[in-house]
């Protein structure tokens, strides 16, 4: 059974932006329902909710040619639309709500080049409850970095999504459980009841 120290736990809802949700989660209603329920339970239990989103300045100066993943964004107006305007905002079903923190990143991991670690240290956070889109992107990258920084990670498997279902399942089944507690949304809600 999952046990969380409420004073030292934060939940990271990662890359759950309107444009990304529309591309990666079909249909999105069940995913958004589970994620919204988790965030509601976390807020009610006074856990810190942190939304991590991908975003860039006009002209995309954060993206260099050597970054294979994001170089495609720089050359494609279609990809840029995923991060621009309302499509780049946190999905309205999830927040942000008063008290939530929004961290903008320019790479895959929630930690790379952001002030996330400073926020976590300032709040004496030791446990990170992670979910988001994509399992093989931000979730994997943030999990590995969190482990290396000695956080105690929890992955909400049914609040993660990936375009590649086989890769998603392999990560959840074969890798994540070696580095984190892997639970479902109902487990987090029950732990906070």
PLM features per residue range, with description:
Residues 16, 54, 158:
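Active-site loop/turn elements of alpha/beta-hydrolase fold enzymes
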Residues 1-10, 37-45, 70-193:
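Active-site-adjacent betaalpha module
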Residues 17-23:
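Short acidic, Gly/Ser-rich segments with clustered Asp/Glu that frequently serve as metal-coordination loops
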Residues 7-9, 25-42, 46-55:
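A short alpha/beta connector and helix-capping loop motif
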